[in-house]
Amino acid sequence: MPFLSINLVFERLNMEKYDIVMVFPAMGKTVVSEEDSRFVDCDTFKYHYRIPNKLSHLPIDKLKGADSLIPINHWEDTFIESLEHCSGVPLVNTNILIYNKLVELGKRVLVVLPLKKDFDLVMQRIRDRGGIDYDDSWVSWFENLYSEFGRANVIEYIGANELSERLKGWKDYGYL
């Protein structure tokens, strides 16, 4: 049965070969990259911020949202350049600026967003791991991100817990 559903997804999307997969936050890209070496979790965090020495001992999930991080100007170009040297299929968090630059460069980007019914579940995961407080401004930022990507060229809406299975299937069938 999973074989049939994967083929239907390919047919519906008229899938071609994609260079990069952009995934909505908290859908499991880190887990997938840890399970399967064909995928690389390309986190923008280390390109986007300079970490002060006093925080350098903390793991990345504890650093996100820290007040003393130092933003890096024009980090996007360095990040995009780093994708060229990836040893697998790059999995990137959704970012409309990065998406537009990649498309401009001729990269084929598949955008993966949660189904509307799973949006609240994904938001709860982000809150649970300390990524955001339950604050209207953060929630609306993610809702805006969701709607911005609703206009992407190739988009796939999947359940919040389906990323691993879908990515592996797409890779096995030659679409990534």
Regions found by a protein language model. Name each.
Residues Y18-D36:
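Glycine-rich phosphate-binding P-loop
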Residues G88-T94:
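Structural recognition of the conserved hydrophobic beta-strand(s) that form the central parallel beta-sheet
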Residues A26-M27, T94-I98:
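Short, polar loop motifs at secondary-structure junctions
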Residues E34-L83:
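Conserved substrate/cofactor phosphate-moiety recognition/catalytic segment
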Residues N93, L105-R125:
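Conserved phosphate-donor/acceptor-positioning beta-strand/loop module used by diverse small-molecule
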Residues Y49-L55, D118-R127, L167:
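Short, charged, surface-exposed secondary-structure boundary motifs
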Residues D128-L176:
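Small-molecule kinase domains that catalyze NTP-dependent phosphoryl transfer to phosphate-bearing small molecules
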Residues P2-N14:
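Short, Lys/Arg-enriched N-terminal segments with co-localized hydrophobic residues
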